[in-house]
Curated annotation (Swiss-Prot):
Probably participates in a plant defense mechanism. Contains 3 disulfide bonds. This is a cyclic peptide. This is Cyclotide cter-K. The keyword Disulfide bond applies.
Length: 29
């Protein structure tokens, strides 16, 4: 999995719309 360049510590991943998900406070695809 590659990082999406987004964190999800305080807010959910915006990048979920492009297939990313939150893992260990970082958004991965």
């Amino acid at each position: 999995h590659e990082p999406c360049g987004e964190s999800c510590v305080f807010i959910p991943c915006i990048t979920t719309v492009v297939g990313c998900s939150c893992k260990n406070k970082v958004c991965y695809n």
